[in-house]
A protein has these predicted regions:
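Conserved ATP-binding subdomain of kinase catalytic cores across diverse folds
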Residues: 46-304
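Short Lys/Arg-enriched alpha/beta "domain-start" segment
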Residues: 2-40
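Charged, amphipathic alpha-helical segments
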Residues: 37-49
Length: 304
């Protein structure tokens, strides 16, 4: 059962009463918050989990809307001494507690380093109702060991609905912002491929973070090996096509042969003309490899 000291219990209870009125404005400023277009009716705080050592708290906020289903967000926050920092939230003082200023913990370097150590060391933290635990997999040791020294974390800015942290191009930690009871599909696929399949053309699952209460487990985040890349396949395709069209527009059409007039469906089974293949470069080989890997992934998932 979760246990906390009496002063800490009082502080957590105070946060539970104050956060519902302080959170709406904070949430509307966050890029990962999915309810910006909806009217917030009320916020409940079902649990708060103190993350020891770094003066941080994992806050679970259930957001009720005027219309439609409620959503639950997992919000790690760290207490700071002064306002004015990015993603900060202020709770005014009362007779029992001084002013409380919190900021998004994923913007805090010390917290991010602590989170990685927590996964490596199987840390767990009790909350008001449940507990959070961090679990490494066998793959973590081959990717990074704490004895090798600290690695520098950096928060990625590209994602909208979740938040990802890169650790020295060795590891990537994805924290789920909107959470639901049960195993997150991304994590479920990673666990299945690692434990039940020989398919290895995905980032290795190095660990995960979950919340446990009387209703079971809720996925909070997953740690994976970092894969060097040049962006996603869609952007890669757009760049390749732009370069192809530019090359074609500047080329001499003489000797290119007659342009096929059939539909794309009819042409899909025909070989690509040599001139077109030369102009588009290595893209077709990359697209073919992507198709093979996608098919292999689906076969691996279907083997369950």
């Amino acid at each position: 059962m979760p246990t906390n000291s009496s002063p800490e219990k009082s502080f957590l209870a105070y946060l539970q009463t104050q956060l519902p009125s302080a959170l709406p404005q904070f949430l509307l400023q966050q890029r990962w918050f999915g309810g910006k277009a909806r009217q917030i009716q009320s916020i409940e705080i079902p649990d708060i989990v103190p993350l020891t050592t770094v003066n941080a708290y994992l806050i679970f906020a259930r957001v009720n809307y005027a219309e439609g289903p409620a959503e639950t967000y997992a919000i790690p926050m760290v207490r700071i001494s002064s306002e004015g920092q990015a993603s900060s939230l202020r709770i005014h003082p009362d007779r029992s507690f001084a002013e409380i200023i919190l900021k998004d913990a994923l913007t805090d370097q010390q917290f991010l380093a602590h989170l990685l150590d927590a996964v490596a060391n199987r840390a767990s933290w009790p909350g008001i109702k449940g507990q959070v635990r961090a679990v490494p997999t066998s793959a973590l040791e081959s990717l990074w060991r704490p004895a090798e020294g600290p690695i520098t974390p950096s928060l990625m800015n590209a994602e909208q609905s979740n938040s990802s942290v890169v650790y020295d191009k060795l590891l990537v930690l994805k924290m789920f912002r909107r959470v639901e009871a049960g195993l997150n599909p991304d994590l479920e696929i990673g666990v299945f491929l690692m434990e039940k399949s020989s398919f290895r053309n995905v980032p290795p699952l190095a660990g995960y973070i979950e919340y446990l209460d009387e209703h079971g487990a809720t996925s909070l985040g997953m740690l994976q090996g970092y894969v060097a890349n040049q962006g996603d396949a869609w952007q890669f395709t757009l760049r390749a096509l732009a370069e192809y069209y530019e090359a074609v527009s500047q080329s001499n059409a003489a000797g290119a042969g007659e342009i096929p007039r059939a539909s794309l469906v009819a042409l899909s089974g025909q070989p690509v003309p040599d001139e077109a293949r030369r102009r588009i470069g290595a893209y077709l080989d990359s697209a073919a490899l992507l198709g093979r890997r996608t098919a292999e992934l689906h076969l691996a998932l279907a083997s369950r």
